[in-house]
């Protein structure tokens, strides 16, 4: 799974997702992409699942880029533990996504294959997405 090699602090505040994305809103590497329409947290497992779904469909053709990285730790307390006594231990990592952010890019495949690969990837993600084409 994706996670940072080293972090300055173990735990982070939950935070709020306000507004639209200002960075990463245009295609940089590929010809086709998947853009988020909703705000949300995407876990490391969901990112990996989307990547596997898209690459399996493309069958080693073309290239795929992940434009998001899970850099926010999410903590969880054990089951049946009373409230208080500090924050729980780090459970998994998430990527905070705002609307308008390009999540995945694909190149080196035709339009139909790229669209279907990204559709399969989008089914693994917890946010609504749309298919975008470079210069269209």
From Swiss-Prot:
NCBIfam families the UniProt entry points to: rplP_bact
Sequence similarity: Belongs to the universal ribosomal protein uL16 family.
Native source organism of the sequence: Karelsulcia muelleri (strain GWSS) (Sulcia muelleri)
Pfam families per UniProt: Ribosomal_L16 (PF00252)
Gene that this sequence comes from: rplP
InterPro entries given in the database record: Ribosomal_uL16, Ribosomal_uL16_bact-type, Ribosomal_uL16_CS, Ribosomal_uL16_dom, Ribosomal_uL16_sf
Protein name: Large ribosomal subunit protein uL16
Keywords attached to this entry: Ribonucleoprotein, Ribosomal protein, RNA-binding, rRNA-binding, tRNA-binding
GO biological process terms held by the UniProt record: translation
Quaternary state and interactors: Part of the 50S ribosomal subunit.
Cellular component per GO, a single term: cytosolic large ribosomal subunit
Gene3D superfamilies: Ribosomal protein L10e/L16
Molecular function per GO: rRNA binding; structural constituent of ribosome; tRNA binding
Role summary: Binds 23S rRNA and is also seen to make contacts with the A and possibly P site tRNAs.
Superkingdom of the organism of origin: Bacteria
CDD domains associated with the record: Ribosomal_L16_L10e
Keyword Ribosomal protein set for record: yes
């Amino acid at each position: 799974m994706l996670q940072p090699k080293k972090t300055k602090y173990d735990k982070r505040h939950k935070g709020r997702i306000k507004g639209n994305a200002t960075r990463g809103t245009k295609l940089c590497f590929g010809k086709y992409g998947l853009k988020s329409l909703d705000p949300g947290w995407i876990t490391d497992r969901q990112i990996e699942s989307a990547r596997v779904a898209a690459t399996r469909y493309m069958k080693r053709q073309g290239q795929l880029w992940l434009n998001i990285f899970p850099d926010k730790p999410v903590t969880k307390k054990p089951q049946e533990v009373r409230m208080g006594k500090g924050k729980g231990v780090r459970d998994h990592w998430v990527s905070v996504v705002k609307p308008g952010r390009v999540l995945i890019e694909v190149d080196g495949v035709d339009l139909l294959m790229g669209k279907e690969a990204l559709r399969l990837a989008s089914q693994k993600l917890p946010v609504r997405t749309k298919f975008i084409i470079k210069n269209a």
